[in-house]
Amino acid sequence: VFKHVLYIIKENRTYDQVMGDLPQGRGMKSLCIFGDSITPNQHQIAKDYLLLDNYYVSGKGSAEGHHWASAGMVTDYTEKSVRAWFRSYPHVLYDAMVYNKNGLIWNNALDHGKTVRIYGEACDFHFDGKKKYDWKTLFDKRKNNDLADFKYHSTSTISRIRPFLSQTFPGGDNETVSDQMRADDFIRELKETEANGGELPNLMVMALPNDHTAGTNPLFPTPRAMVADNDLALGRIVEAINNSKFAENTVIFVSEDDSQAGWDHISSYRTTGFVISPYNRLQKTVSTQYNQTSMLRTMEQILGLPPMNVIDATALPMFDCFSKTPDFSFKYKPRQNLIPLDEMNPIRAKLSGAALKFHDQSIKYAFQEIDKGDDDLLNKILWFSIKGKKRYPAKLAGEENEID
């Protein structure tokens, strides 16, 4: 049925943080900070296709999360060096000792004759030349159609994927770039492929990272604006696939890489996940327990690939997410953001109390760099940015030690 798989890896949210306001799922509305008004597309996709309310990540941070998401396991070395990272941070794969010897999902695809394209995953992003940009400057340049002088490239330590790594898609470890620019590039390439009579790769892996947020750093948008940016980008990508000639034989899988040890009333590992295609128009809640290895196993079966290790080999494929009867008539229409995407965090001079403290900590710990700072501290900052002085749900988060 399917010839093409698009696998989108987002950053660090729990189910209750995003979907907790949906009454048809097992959510706790009081824990929801990025609900329908901030993530209208994820909510609409859950209604139009299916809602997964029992889907889990396997790692608490991106160092483990991206390996679980792409390899279906983490190495013993990675487990034993969690939060130490003596040689380098595993997310961008500078340390060869973090690699699973059986490879990652793209190795599996290439080894079995499939075509692959990598959009921003497993790579590092670099500005060309001496000129660097901040988030607002780049956002305004895009709005004014003035990106001709914006030059950049991505690098990867994995020689196998370098020929398939997009150099026009901004690498996924840099939040200075709006996710709209990432969506722009993917949609441009999709339309060019279609116009030229080409074919999409069998496996496409995409990083869409800005729901990670940068805390309350004044050089970046507010947390809710960054999550809204990510949500709109996802909606636009789904629409583009849905309206292309590839719609009938393409399936989109969406997962967070990890939960950032965030709060959730079921589990701090529970997260958002989506399966999108004409065969997923169930319009119901699927409460079967699945996790990242289930998603990988499903992709492997769709592409005719063997499992990479014993963990994905024994994972339950996502059978309950698919119907035998497709709905080819439905065309997804993205919902527009209700939050201005360039709603910036306030500057220090306008702050006091907890807002001032969290402003300073957001800068000190550089939360715009994936998992640079303490997860639980960033969770507290995100909670405060939306909920104000309401008590932080520490007992429902993954961090045991409370930070005053």
Region annotations inferred by a language model:
Residues V1-D404:
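N-terminal pro-sequences and low-complexity stem/linker regions of secreted or lumenal proteins
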